[in-house]
């Protein structure tokens, strides 16, 4: 569909975000909902990994958890790290049930959460994304230990399983205050982990230095999971517009409720809102470049037209522009 699109630099868009939106646009015919957008935004970065890698990572994280006496669990299964570790050990020793084997294979691509003491007394207000260099398991373990040493300040952190080693944010540290970024930097420096961090950071995050990205947490929006009667399950109503209606504000499209969503879900929320508007309004030229630029314009509006979003201004660090500006510069004065 978009093979003939000419992608021009735009001051409204960070180059990494423009690249992401270009890839999403190319896949637009297959995108059915916000969750599809999220999958592209998240950039899962799946790579080949085996249970030996997983077992080594889990054992190192368990050592850290035990040493510092932190809480921990697995993101999707919501199991405590020690329980999950026993399942993987059982699989490696060929004495596991089929269910345990399935769980263990699933852990390869999951996030492991480490809850620091402040996780129970403050709300995460910002995040630091860390891109870990190879060898992943060894270096991720070193970075995790460095973050654990910052327990007096940080909220929590999570470490991706070895099958997620291709992501740009394999480790994410959550901060109680944006000012605590300096604590993370110092912790990494004091722990001599310079060789463990490098490469690119996720779109929509400010690059502090190679391999280290920063952003404030998004505003309150629907959560992925809900807990009822002590049982945690997938929030099936998360994308139900009747349950979580969207409203148009000066800051773009926002839910009316007071819950939270992840950083990636927040941006998928905005991009999907722009795509919906583009699909609803667009009736026009066969010129693929103009079609693509109209899509970008609707995404730009969905983010709020200015620096896209007050909470995460790094996605679009540039100018505020109008439809007239876009017509002149990007639409070749074509009018819908």
Where are these regions (language model features)?
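Structured alpha/beta or helical-core interaction and ligand-binding surfaces enriched in interleaved
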Residues: 1-336
